[in-house]
């Protein structure tokens, strides 16, 4: 009996077992509801019902912004992978390899150029899944290159921020990207081009202390965590209890730090409208279909029938009687 239970039965179970993909279902962080992954993906990673905004990868974000889901990937400068030969529990180069394998991206920032409702724009997206969207040399160079391209193309620049801050494995070289990106934003301003920032969940640390809070227009997604230091650190420093919703997008909007909180489904038309207003670009001409008037059709049909069927000649007048 032991042979049957210990050897044969496990083998049968292994044969009949069907593996279930890990990402088949998604649990809503707000309500705990289990939602089918494909439904969330088709809904732009917004949980149906609760409207909780999940994190969005860089490629999916660019796909949701540009017309026909097409754009040109901007070639980005190469940087030294591990300038400080940094190691904590693991080597920094090993962490980068794992992040690249997980996301399929070269680093935390992806830049694209394409059309947004017919208007050429440059967009940069931080991917939080790549080492927390941390700002390092590669990310800094990517943002700067995107801003330079916007000046070259005379196009608006849209920044989708999502980061835990500067990348500690690169030390001062990471912190250097804060003033460098700030200078690049200023060059865009001097060219008279709009810089629009979309703050997504989360945007914290050195990113909020630099380019993420320099937008001509500051947008945020609902419920996004936005701040420099964490709420717990602030409470321990000031020895006071923070108000409810502190550092959330809605709180920042109510206190003047953010211009608008925009649902992800409304983000694309909102960005297009802002870009057109700030660049004084008229709406593209739309050929309106000819309006068919049923009454006019009836009149035309009757007129055609009258022309095609001439009236019968009138009978000759009768002779007068004597």
UniProtKB/Swiss-Prot annotation:
Catalysed reactions listed for this entry: N(6)-carboxybiotinyl-L-lysyl-[protein] + acetyl-CoA = N(6)-biotinyl-L-lysyl-[protein] + malonyl-CoA
Transmembrane segments: none
UniProt GO molecular function: acetyl-CoA carboxylase activity; ATP binding; carboxyl- or carbamoyltransferase activity
UniProt keyword annotation of Lipid biosynthesis present: yes
Function description: Component of the acetyl coenzyme A carboxylase (ACC) complex. Biotin carboxylase (BC) catalyzes the carboxylation of biotin on its carrier protein (BCCP) and then the CO(2) group is transferred by the transcarboxylase to acetyl-CoA to form malonyl-CoA.
Keywords recorded for this protein, A-Z: ATP-binding, Cytoplasm, Fatty acid biosynthesis, Fatty acid metabolism, Lipid biosynthesis, Lipid metabolism, Nucleotide-binding, Transferase
Record family assignment: Belongs to the AccD/PCCB family.
GO CC annotations on file: acetate CoA-transferase complex
Enzyme superclass (EC): transferase
EC number(s) reported in the record: 2.1.3.15
UniProt-annotated location(s): Cytoplasm
Chief location category: cytoplasm
Domain CoA carboxyltransferase N-terminal, residue spans: 24-293
PROSITE patterns reported in the protein's UniProt record: COA_CT_NTER
Claim: NADP is one of the keywords in the record: no
Any Gene Ontology biological process: malonyl-CoA biosynthetic process
Organism for this UniProt entry: Rhodopseudomonas palustris (strain HaA2)
Name the UniProt record assigns to this protein: Acetyl-coenzyme A carboxylase carboxyl transferase subunit beta
Pathway where this protein functions: Lipid metabolism; malonyl-CoA biosynthesis; malonyl-CoA from acetyl-CoA: step 1/1
SUBUNIT field: Acetyl-CoA carboxylase is a heterohexamer composed of biotin carboxyl carrier protein (AccB), biotin carboxylase (AccC) and two subunits each of ACCase subunit alpha (AccA) and ACCase subunit beta (AccD).
């Amino acid at each position: 009996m032991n042979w049957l239970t210990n050897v044969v039965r496990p083998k049968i179970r292994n044969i009949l077992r069907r593996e279930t993909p890990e990402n088949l279902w998604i649990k809503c962080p707000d309500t705990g509801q289990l939602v089918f992954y494909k439904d969330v993906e088709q809904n732009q990673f917004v949980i149906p019902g609760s409207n909780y905004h999940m994190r969005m990868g860089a490629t999916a974000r660019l796909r949701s912004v540009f017309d026909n889901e097409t754009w040109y990937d901007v070639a980005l400068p190469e940087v030294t992978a591990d300038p400080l030969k940094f190691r904590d529990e693991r080597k920094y180069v090993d962490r980068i390899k794992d992040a690249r394998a997980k996301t399929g991206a070269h680093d935390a920032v992806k830049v694209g150029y394409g059309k947004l409702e017919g208007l050429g724009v440059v967009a940069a997206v931080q991917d939080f899944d790549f080492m927390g969207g941390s700002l390092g040399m590669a990310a800094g160079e990517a943002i700067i290159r995107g801003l330079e391209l916007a000046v070259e193309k005379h196009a608006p620049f849209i920044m989708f921020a999502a980061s835990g801050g500067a990348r500690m494995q690169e030390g001062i070289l990471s912190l250097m990207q804060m003033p460098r990106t700030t200078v690049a934003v200023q060059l865009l301003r001097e060219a008279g081009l709009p810089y629009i920032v979309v703050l997504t969940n989360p945007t914290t640390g050195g990113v909020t202390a630099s380019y993420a809070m320099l937008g001509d227009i500051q947008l945020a997604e609902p419920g996004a965590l936005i701040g420099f230091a964490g709420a717990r650190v602030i409470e321990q420093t000031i020895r006071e209890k923070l108000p409810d919703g502190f550092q959330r997008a809605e709180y920042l909007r109510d206190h003047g730090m953010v211009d608008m909180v925009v649902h992800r489904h409304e983000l694309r038309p909102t960005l297009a409208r802002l870009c057109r207003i700030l660049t004084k670009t008229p709406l593209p001409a739309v050929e309106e279909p000819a309006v068919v008037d049923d009454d006019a059709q009836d009149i035309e049909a009757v007129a055609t029938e009258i022309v095609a069927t001439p009236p019968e000649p009138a009978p000759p007048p009768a002779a007068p009687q004597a």
